[in-house]
Amino acid sequence: NAWEYVPTGHQVLGVAAIDIDANNPNTMFIGTGEAYGSSENYPGIGPVRTPRGSYGIGILTSTDGGLSWTKSLDWSLNQKKSVQKIQINPLRSESIWAATTDGVYESTDGGDSWSNIHSVTMATDIIINPLDTNMVFVAHGGMGSDGHGIYRTQDGGETFSKANLLVGGGPFEYKGKAVLSMSSEKPNIIYASIGNSDGSLNYE
């Protein structure tokens, strides 16, 4: 019924992502920044980007329920990046995934170090199959991302492939932001809500 401000002790202008370790609720991660925008091509000018929101300083972690915070993924504001989504592997808490403006990052050691495992820009959402955590879906789009679409890995991030086929054949295309949701009872059912310049689209 009531909310309390939680200071982090860091220069945080915005938080777009948070995840709490289901196996240890005192451990949590927040993704800073919430940069998003659009890109339009104008004749004789070229692409013009219109950013919105704020830039971040990476990912912060707390192991004492939010009383204190340390940097996990260390960025600076002048790098102009943000973290859009964080997902902790429900079966292996040391495996953490992050969708960022710089691509997809993964930590395999509980946030001590991070690797960019999928460098397509503007990752906007990420979901992990709770029954098979090697299967992960990532959405990319917006800000002129050169690889907008929904991607899937079935080998824990070793390889990614586009999963943009409509039932009956043919790809669906979009350039706006996409968010994903997975059925808790049937993880093979995934929903995608996609923003386009001509209105939002929803797919299953």
Language-model segment annotations:
Residues N1-E204:
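Extracellular glycan-interacting surfaces
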